[in-house]
Amino acid sequence: MSQFNAESLKYHLPFHSRDDIISMDTNTFVEVIYLRRSSSETRKKILTACVRLFLEQGYKNTSVSQIVDEAGVARGSYLNLFPTKDKILLDLTETMFDGQFGVARSIADSKLPSVYAYAVDTALQLTLTELNENLREIYIEAYTAPDTAEYIYVHTTAELKEIFGGNFPDYTDSDFYEMDIGTAGLMRSYMARKCDIHFPLERKISRFLTAELRVYKVPEEEQAKVLAFIQTLDIKAIATEVMYKLFAMLEMKYDFKLSRDGETEEAK
């Protein structure tokens, strides 16, 4: 019986204990490696298909049957890896929100207080959902589904504490986490309400930021300055650029090609 370096292999085979690895013969080890690689390839196919379909036709309109047909995998394999669509949405949400605040920081002058970057970030999210209905649906679902909402709360808590901690000197991470549950709910509600002639984007952004900044005890004078700064930006043009950069990032990660008119084609 061939023996293997269990200490090094256990990190690559987390679903096996050290003792299991030590006792493996060559054939068993090869089979485990094959199954793991096969599972990884199946997962990638499913994620690629899902992201394409979500962006092309919307989250709710994408069925399990469409996903498995697009991915070319068995329904059982799909359900084994992703019992619900929400599990796939979590992977997509992590990709979309990763580095999102960094984009806002690059737009806001680094010499300005970080509350300006926060305002830009939230204004961009609201604007993105007005530019693309499928993105609106993805964002709303992300703020609604328990796993993705939890990711957003945790992901945002540290930023909130860094930005607004001075206004709440006795608040812990838990306090900011609990506040974010409320403000994230506010964000979801504003995203869900589509803009129209009676409620234009500029008013939506202004109303939302005023409510948010009051929650975090930003002085009225500072609020006015932040809102004035946002009004100087061509937020639709910036959001459009951000949207296409987001699409490009998703194309690269999930290995597909999304055309600018919303149609997708397989990456060659």
Mark where each language-model region is.
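Helix-turn-helix
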Residues: 45, 53-87, 91
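Hydrophobic/aromatic residues within well-ordered alpha-helical segments
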Residues: 85, 92, 96, 100, ...
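C-terminal peripheral helix-coil segments that are non-catalytic and often amphipathic
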Residues: 6, 10-31, 162, 166, ...
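Hydrophobic alpha-helical connector segments
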Residues: 91, 102-137, 144-145, 153-157
